[in-house]
Amino acid sequence: MIDPDGFRPNVGIILTNDAGQVLWARRINQDAWQFPQGGINPEETPEDALYRELNEEVGLEREDVEILACTRGWLRYRLPQRLVRTHSQPLCIGQKQKWFLLRLISNEQRVRMDLTGKPEFDGWRWVSYWYPLGQVVTFKREVYRRALKELAPRLLARD
């Protein structure tokens, strides 16, 4: 599902632990790290997609997490031209994302990245809240900055 402007609806997941660190996941067979994220299917709400992606990508269920906050609007990024599939219709030029800030309320041993036939990640670690800004691929950096900045007060408010 791609909107009329060429952006694919998507959810981004910032999963925190009790120390305020965030789960940082390594893309399979790559030295590239990112937050879990994934597309919203036509029949899904962003929250439905959040729970589906959370399970597919990190093996967690609804009862393993608490939603602390969600971005108010959609945050967009454009794909670099080399990643745009110019022969696909409709043409997708980027993603528009709703970002969710979650707190892990179960044991971190429940995190599993091998539950699907095609896992997206092969490793993970806890990092400081702002660490991803200096590490994520350049074209996603501004969306990460905006999401982290908007959601940070909600993380701090629970302390």
UniProtKB/Swiss-Prot annotation:
Cofactor(s) recorded in Swiss-Prot or TrEMBL = a divalent metal cation
* Record Pfam families: NUDIX
Q: Tell me which EC number(s) this protein carries.
A: 3.6.1.-
Which InterPro entries does the annotation name? Answer: Nudix_hydrolase, NUDIX_hydrolase-like_dom_sf, NUDIX_hydrolase_CS, NUDIX_hydrolase_dom, RppH
Q: Please name the Gene3D superfamilies in this protein's record.
A: Nucleoside Triphosphate Pyrophosphohydrolase
Q: What does this protein do?
A: Accelerates the degradation of transcripts by removing pyrophosphate from the 5'-end of triphosphorylated RNA, leading to a more labile monophosphorylated state that can stimulate subsequent ribonuclease cleavage.
Report the family membership.
Belongs to the Nudix hydrolase family. RppH subfamily.
Q: Protein name, please?
A: RNA pyrophosphohydrolase
Question: What gene does this protein come from?
Answer: rppH
